[in-house]
Amino acid sequence: MAWAISGLLVILGYLLGSIPTGYLMVRALKGIDIREQGSGSTGATNVLRTVGKTAAIAVLIIDMLKAMVAVGGVKLLYFGVPSAIVPLDWKPWLIVTVASAAILGHSKSIFLNFTGGKSVASSLGVLLVLNPLVALGALASFLFMLGITRIVSLSSITGAIAVNLLMLVLHQPLAYILFAILAGIYVIVRHKTNISRILQGTEPKIGQKLTEEAETV
């Protein structure tokens, strides 16, 4: 029973993460496929360049909420299901497994032939449920780097690194620390083209032409 419930939660987490918010938003507002616009990503940054600020903010919030609901569902499970059915010592590991599934779904959506965004928004949503202090610290690191460089991709990578440091400093459970490492690596890998441009000095900054601006969310 425990394995069946856990497996179901992981599948639901992935399906929630897979909901293509950006794709649906742009399709509804402009009747076009966002994957054929800009960077081809379905994330909030590409929505910003394709539709505008209001739609991008809505996509950002919804993408965060998808991950929050997925992870929050696991925490709620332990309020209503006896530990004899789902062992209590599974909790942190089940939480991070579902979180990973939601993040993967955001970037590899089953509804869009396994395409999607860069998983930054969904990762932030997960962190807000795991540990709000870590989430706020990562956000502060992101904003600090953004203020200095005006490069969103570099700021996202900085935030991913900050998460790992904060998990260690705040003495989080081993499951959370391992999750932070793997999720951080995944987010950074999703930005590999951005990293290449950063090293070449060609990564666009905020305010440059939309066709040149780097996608990160």
Curated annotation (Swiss-Prot):
User: Where does it mainly reside?
Assistant: membrane
Enzyme Commission number: 2.3.1.275
Task: Look up the record and name the pathway of this protein.
Answer: Lipid metabolism; phospholipid metabolism
One Pfam match = G3P_acyltransf
User: What reaction is this protein's catalytic activity?
Assistant: an acyl phosphate + sn-glycerol 3-phosphate = a 1-acyl-sn-glycero-3-phosphate + phosphate
Checking InterPro entries in the record gives: G3P_acylTferase_PlsY
Mention any one GO cellular component term assigned to this protein in its UniProt record: plasma membrane
PANTHER family for this protein: GLYCEROL-3-PHOSPHATE ACYLTRANSFERASE-RELATED (PTHR30309:SF0), INNER MEMBRANE PROTEIN YGIH (PTHR30309)
Subunit structure comment from the entry: Probably interacts with PlsX.
Q: What is this protein identified as?
A: Glycerol-3-phosphate acyltransferase
Native source organism of the sequence = Rippkaea orientalis (strain PCC 8801 / RF-1) (Cyanothece sp. (strain PCC 8801))
